[in-house]
Amino acid sequence: ITIVGGGHAGIEAAHIAAQFGLRVAIITMPGIGLGSAPCNPSVGGVGKGQVVREIDALGGIMGVLADKAGIQFRTLNDSKGFAVQSTRVQIDKELYSVYAEELISAVENITVIREKVNTITQSEPGFEITTTERSYRTSKIIMTVGTFLNGKLHTGSSQTMGGRVDCDKSEGLQTLFSAIKTTP
């Protein structure tokens, strides 16, 4: 399995697939840490807390990484009833990525490739992925491109293209979903 994108979703997918004994390659942009949090450095909260618990129950790693990289742990709505209370942790975003790198690199079945994906084409039986460095063939792809797919940054009244500040975008992938035929 090849996973395009090494953010939260990418490392979760890679970790779970490897637990099932599958060989996994994560292709992610160079210079960006695994599990990088692009915006808000919080994990949990009233809405996202449920998702984090579900990921944890399914064997995921977000909760483990958040516990290790946490700098503030808080129960929200603690003056209200249990139904609306939730745990939220503010994380050190750089430390979170460091721990994600350590955890993923320790898993034998996962290879991390730090290259920018330019194109993905469907070629039976599977796909050909062309990066800035070389081409790869794979039978299965999981796309977890996050904010990097046709990304646009708004700063005041100006707009620039990019995945987030100081990061490139994946312009070669923006037409991917309309070009690839999917089956339910």
Could you say what each language-model-derived stretch is?
Residues 1-9:
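Beta1/beta-strand and adjacent pyrophosphate-binding region of the FAD-binding site
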Residues 4, 143-144:
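Redox-cofactor binding/interface segments in oxidoreductases and associated redox assembly factors
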Residues 15-119, 144-168, 172-174, 178-184:
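Conserved N-terminal/central alpha/beta ligand/cofactor-binding core
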Residues 123-128:
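Short, hydrophobic/aromatic-rich segments at coil-to-beta transitions
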Residues 131-140:
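Core beta-strand elements of the Rossmann-like FAD/NAD(P) dinucleotide-binding domain
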